[in-house]
C-alpha cells in the first residue's frame, strides 16, 4: 500500500530523479534517493513544509535536487527505474536513508552532522542525514 499518493506520471518522475541522482550507485543507491524523496513528501517539516506531492518535491526551489538542472534527468522514464520508484512509494525503506531528508556527496569523509542534522550513514559516495523524530515525526 502506498505511503504517499502517486499517479503513474509521478512514479515516472520519481524514477527519473532516482536514476539521475544515483544511477552510478546501483539499485540500492537509487532506492535510498527515493526514500529521501518520499520522506520529504511525507514529512511536512523543516525545509519541506507544504511539500505535498512528488512534483513539488522534485522541483522544490530552493532545496530541491541538482539533477533537475541536467539534461539526462529529462530522458524518458525506463521501466526498471519506475519499478524502483513504485517500491519506495509503497513504503520500502533502505538504511541509511530510511528516515533521511537529505543526502550529499562529500569530497572526503561524511561529517557527523550537516546543518544540525545527524548523519545516519554512508552508501558508496553519498552521506545521508535525518532529522530527529521530535522535529519530523512523520518520517519515523
Where are these predicted regions, by residue range?
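Bacterial extracytoplasmic/cell-wall-associated proteins, especially those involved in peptidoglycan
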Residues: 2-140
